Swiss-Prot record:
Assigned protein family: Belongs to the ABC1 family. UbiB subfamily.
GO CC annotations on file: plasma membrane
Keyword RNA-binding: no
Protein name according to UniProt: Probable protein kinase UbiB
Keywords: ATP-binding, Cell inner membrane, Cell membrane, Kinase, Membrane, Nucleotide-binding, Transferase, Transmembrane, Transmembrane helix, Ubiquinone biosynthesis
Binding site for ATP: 125-133, 151
Subcellular location: Cell inner membrane
Phylogenetic classification of the source organism: Bacteria, Pseudomonadati, Pseudomonadota, Betaproteobacteria, Burkholderiales
Pathway: Cofactor biosynthesis; ubiquinone biosynthesis [regulation]
Taxonomic superkingdom: Bacteria
């Protein structure tokens, strides 16, 4: 289908499902709304707007369904009724012909499939818009037979994606220029985010690298299993990983009858997430029930099994500090500190007044404290902060929006397993440990150790550099020599002060830790 024909199809779907009312209601051009009313005269729309939007996206195909799923995570931009409805979108499409999958594998490895796998199940076990999964058996480097899951990219996806994305970018430009809410909704930003998301999913080597990183990070935590990646069998269009066997986490009664401790399972999920966030700064960002199973094997009984690593989040130390300090300030009801943190982040316009931002944050956050602490949703706290920040033109970073979406998923899953789950009591030790690591002597020692090779490299060179400098200067220029010696003395005094001050600081912290237990509040 040509781009023009596809554009006509999209316009027809928009009018059929009444999305013109949803979009044009904020347009500043009265004539545009008038023309649309004439075209759609006599149309009856009974369904709510969120349902109509969901059905329209489903009718436009899998790429638009995925776009709706991404929109559902941007609750800082979307009204709640629309975000809730879009969250119901399912990325389910009929599987493509197994012969096509086999041809893709043979093209990737340049040999017959019988030489790649010991056996290959033609019937796919899962299918989505981007890829489908088959089970197979390989021989690893040691010659052992291993059961694997083979993810094969759906052929011909890139041209379709690029065509639909070009239309989305064009429509986003129209909305941003014509709508009164265009700048606030940032449609171009959302489409660009979706563009990156889709192209990341199209690279299965990238997904394999994500899985390998998570597996390495989680090796010391006996709560979660990450499948092994078989790199000899991976390609941009084919991903081969260890086959994992477990029970889907939403089959709670089956897990309970098997003897799994359900409340512990809920707490373990939160522990896994906060370990990935605050210890590793690298987290699985697609933690919906379809990607999580629970092992019933005797040696790994009750552990989580994570699947599908196409979407991950990465946090810097600055991001982690922003999160930790915002959460702790929120639970202290220190709204001024929350406002200051937003301004210190550098994401706020320079003219923003702290007291105005503080008042807005107080208005949004204070009602939470009418309920028990265990009922407070950390994901909703972040969401409300982001929504308030948007009013002040704060540029919320994409990785934090991704984290907020994942946190909401984790909370929802945890409370589905255990309605009495106290998320804050589980998260608090991670925040305390992270704050202690940032403020305590461990951080100073880490920084000194990290810089030691640099100091060791330059210190032996200082006498030679000084000698070379003096030789290059005229012998009668004693003023420069005196100035250099004076500077050297000042530098020596400064270094001594830093060393003595650092030792005093470390000793003071050690004494403080002996007599005072460090707590957030």
């Amino acid at each position: 289908m040509s781009r023009f024909a596809r554009g006509i199809t999209i316009v027809w779907v928009v009018l059929r499902y009444g999305l013109d009312e949803l979009v044009l209601s904020t347009f500043r051009q009265p004539w545009l709304r008038a023309v649309t009313r004439v075209i759609t005269f006599g149309r009856k729309l009974d369904a709510p707007r969120g349902q109509r939007l969901r059905e329209a996206l489903e009718s436009l195909g899998p790429i638009f369904v995925k776009f709706g799923q991404v929109l559902s995570t941007r609750r800082d931009l979307m009204p709640p009724d629309i975000a809730d409805e879009l969250a119901l979108l399912q990325d389910r499409v009929p599987p493509f012909d197994p012969d096509v999958a086999i041809a893709t594998i043979e093209r990737a490895f340049r040999r017959p499939i019988g030489e790649v796998f010991v056996s290959f199940d033609r019937q796919p076990v899962a299918s989505a818009s981007i890829a489908q999964v088959h089970f197979a058996v390989i021989r690893d480097r040691q010659g052992h037979a291993r059961e694997v899951a083979v993810k094969v990219l759906r052929p011909g996806m890139l041209p379709v994606i690029d065509k639909d994305l070009a239309l989305m970018r064009m429509m986003a430009g129209w909305v941003e220029s014509l709508s009164a809410d265009g700048k606030r909704l940032k449609p171009r930003e959302v489409v660009a985010e979706f563009d990156n998301y889709l192209h990341d999913e199209l690279d299965l080597v990238r997904e394999a690298a994500n899985a390998a990183q998570l597996r390495r990070n989680m090796q010391g935590l006996d709560l979660v299993l990450i499948p092994e990646v078989f790199w000899d069998f991976c390609h941009a269009e084919v991903l081969v990983m260890e086959r994992m066997k477990g029970v889907p986490i939403n089959q709670v009664e089956r897990l309970r009858s098997a003897g799994v401790d359900i409340p512990k399972l809920a707490r373990d999920g939160v522990t896994i997430f906060f370990t990935q966030v605050f210890r590793d700064g690298f987290f699985h960002a697609d933690m919906h029930p379809g990607n999580i199973q629970v092992s019933l094997a005797p040696e790994t009984f009750g552990r989580y099994i994570s699947l599908d690593f196409g979407i991950v989040g990465t946090l810097t130390e600055f991001d982690k500090e922003y999160l930790a300090q915002n959460f702790t300030a929120f639970f202290r009801r220190d709204y001024k500190r929350v406002a200051e943190l937003h301004i210190e982040s550098g994401w706020v316009p320079a003219h923003t007044r702290v007291n105005e931002l503080e008042a807005a944050i107080r208005t949004v956050c204070e009602p939470y404290f009418d309920r028990p602490l265990k009922e407070i949703s950390l994901g909703m706290v972040l969401l409300r902060l982001f929504q308030t920040s948007r009013r002040f033109q704060v540029e919320i970073q994409p990785q934090l929006v991704l984290l907020q979406k994942t946190l909401l998923n984790i909370e929802g899953l945890g409370r589905q397993l255990d309605p009495d789950l106290d998320l804050w009591s589980t998260a608090k030790p991670f925040l305390e440990k992270w704050m202690l690591d940032q403020l305590g002597p461990q951080r100073l020692w880490r920084e000194l150790r990290a810089e030691a090779p640099h100091y060791a490299k330059i210190l032996p060179d200082l006498p030679r550099l000084l000698h070379d400098f003096l030789r290059q200067r005229p012998h009668d220029n004693r003023g420069d020599l005196q100035e250099l010696l004076a500077t050297q003395k000042r530098t020596n005094r400064l270094l001594q002060s830093i060393i003595y001050g650092g030792l005093g600081f470390v000793l003071g912290l050690l004494v403080m830790q002996l007599f005072v237990r460090v707590r957030i509040f």
